[in-house]
From Swiss-Prot:
Signal peptide: none
Organism: Rickettsia rickettsii (strain Sheila Smith)
GO MF: lipoyl(octanoyl) transferase activity
Main location: cytoplasm
GO biological process, one term: protein modification process
Name of this protein: Octanoyltransferase
Gene coding for it: lipB
Active site residues according to the UniProt entry: 174
Amino acid sequence: MIRFITIPDFADYQVILKLMEDYVNKVINDHEPEIIYLVEHSEVYTAGTNYKQEELLNYGDIPVIYTGRGGKFTFHGPGQRVIYPILNLDSPNRYKDLKLYIKMLEEWIINSLNYFGIKAYIIKDKVGIWVKVRKDEFAKIAAIGVRVRKWVTYHGVAINISTDLSKFSGIIPCGLENSLVTSLNQLGIHVEMSEFDKIIQTEFNKIFK
């Protein structure tokens, strides 16, 4: 069974990035076991490899870090559960298929949200996980941005639990102008991070066998 490691407190993004990269190297070179980091970051904007500078609007005192993950700008901060799976897609029980991996991530998060009574969706040509907030109007509740090195995955998924959503106004989230963001709290679902973690671990084991 894959071990989930919860990082305490509000973690510095660059510290966690180095932690991930170091462990990816260990999986590749030393055949270390797969793990999943559960993180709650201190406030930071991060940019993926497809970012456009004009999508960074008004970041104030919040640091901006340019990363190697896929995607564009997003926000990380308190109240958001960030999940970093370090999985070896070139192992006997996996598939060397990045699109399939992302699809499995999406299914995992959708099923976890469904446990709390949230109907979540994938929208064609829009990355991430979405919920309907009004008729024909959707808001993003989870962002996805991954990278693979020698078929070992890192970076991952960020789910808004009780995140300060006003911080997303400093960017065009994921490059989608006029798109809405939401959280479990905003949808009326108040859950402790530890309770949410139990569900994502249970649902993970149903998808990634």
